[in-house]
Amino acid sequence: GYTFNEDGNLLLDDLANNTTTLDLSGTQISTDALAELSMFPNLTDVDLSDNGYGPAFDFAKLPEQITGIDLTGNEIYDYDNLVSVVVEENGDETVTNLHEITKLYLPETAKENIEDLVRFYRQNKEAITAGTIDMKMTDVDGNLQTYTTLRDVPDANLLTYLQTNFADLFNGDQIDLSKHLGLDQKTKELLVAPADNVTNFEGIQFLVENPYWEGAKISLYSAGEESIASMPNIKVGKFITQVILQNIEVEDIDLSNATDLRSAWVQNNPALQKLDLSYSTIWGQGDKETEGNGTYGSSLMVLGCPILKEIKLPEKNELKAYRIDIECLDALETFDMSNVKMVAELSIGDLNKDFNLVYPELTIFYSEDGYAGTYFACSENTFYRESTQAFLKANYTDIDPDDTVRRLGYTSSLSYDKNKGCRWRTLLNKQK
């Protein structure tokens, strides 16, 4: 019913001037086009539900006059430019609203967000309680409910573990996202062992992604190898140096903030398609003495992930690592190790037969025991790959006898019980 002139500009007739609310639900309007809503001089409320937005929504795209917004039905996890946060050295926070809000209706995925929404809620709690700000969130059934910072942990064993080790986060049997961790729990490592018998890790994200948790290690194991546990997607924080996930089905492990990550071990994950370590400013970037040490050196183990397509390392000209172990990756398409110049232990099991296996271009051969720079193991299928033959020729068959440290050390052992290492030294001798 709106009228536009020949240049496509809105004519400010009575209809346009009197428009205070606008339903744009299901229109798939891009967020870049939202700035054009400022042409309605009295528009304050807009329905943007079911528009396919996500994983982030940027409030800076909204005209300042829009104070009421419905984002339900979208898959949004991050709410950029809703608030700004300044954290003092003592941990105190100064939160500032970046966009005036009188109504905020959120999708069910908003329950995952702590960084933006919980701080907005805490900053504006008095207005929300008084009804000056109408803040709601849909539940799993799509029904709007009053927004709350309380979150459930469905698995009773996980609940027990978290209440025992991170009690400061809880309000009764629910995690309260508005609570802070005390000093003793703030840096505590997260270790859920097989003996803890967890089969559903729903709720763990509220600790892993909590900005007030500064633990360095995440080690999560399901109840057993035959019991694959479920887990929601997680975004790992900047304090994390080690991630271990075994027998857990999770679609996405976001490591974009994990700049201190040094070690990753993912085993038996039927859902993961990508593992990206490229954000780390630590992995593979220490000196040879550090990286050649089994305790402090960089490590990557990816075993039994049947639909994993891509692994990425930091994009540096020279990487050094203690361990790289990839086995039973039936769908692997992309993993370039050519910038790895030193690795103490290299294990290559069965991989996608069409995968172009690019080996490390080794130039540094350091060993704490003074014997071999790189201990190498592979499966028989991998042994017969052309690139493996070339790697062995360059680093084992044609070595300089005057080398003080042998380039390749022999081992036939692989880590993954569903893969068998071959006696590659014997197979080489048979080829002579």
What kind of feature is each model-predicted range?
Residues 229, 276-299, 307, 320-323, ...:
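Extracellular beta-strand/beta-solenoid scaffold signature
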Residues 27, 51, 74, 107-110, ...:
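Conserved "Asn-ladder"/turn position within leucine-rich repeats
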Residues 42, 64-65, 238-241, 257-262, ...:
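Short "repeat-start/strand-capping" segments in structured domains, especially the N-termini
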